[in-house]
Amino acid sequence: MKEGIHPQVHRAKVHCACGESFETTSTRKEIKVDVCSKCHPFFTGKSRTVEVGGRVDRFKKKYGL
């Protein structure tokens, strides 16, 4: 392997939107994610509510049309 061409690997702290955090290795020191194994429906066994309606419906609701 060549010297000096590989990125530095650090212990990275991963922060989820649900408030959970854990450590892993990465080239970044801090990582922010939207979903982790503590809050993802596949791992929790709970289903999420699926938003009914498309973009047009959301636009009309947002602007009162």
From Swiss-Prot:
PROSITE patterns: RIBOSOMAL_L31
Metal-binding listed as a keyword: yes
InterPro entries the UniProt entry points to: Ribosomal_bL28/bL31-like_sf, Ribosomal_bL31, Ribosomal_bL31_A, Ribosomal_bL31_sf
Gene3D superfamilies attached to this UniProt entry: Ribosomal protein L31
Cofactor(s) the protein requires to work: Zn(2+)
Gene Ontology MF term list: metal ion binding; rRNA binding; structural constituent of ribosome
Free-text remark on how the cofactor is bound: Binds 1 zinc ion per subunit.
Coiled coil feature spans: none
Pfam families: Ribosomal_L31
GO biological process: translation
Keywords: Metal-binding, Ribonucleoprotein, Ribosomal protein, RNA-binding, rRNA-binding, Zinc
Source taxon at top rank: Bacteria
Binding site for Zn(2+): C16, C18, C36, C39
One cellular component term from this protein's GO annotations in UniProt: ribonucleoprotein complex
Similarity section: Belongs to the bacterial ribosomal protein bL31 family. Type A subfamily.
UniProt subunit comment: Part of the 50S ribosomal subunit.
HAMAP family: Ribosomal_bL31_1
Purpose: Binds the 23S rRNA.
Protein name: Large ribosomal subunit protein bL31
Species in which this protein is naturally found: Heliobacterium modesticaldum (strain ATCC 51547 / Ice1)
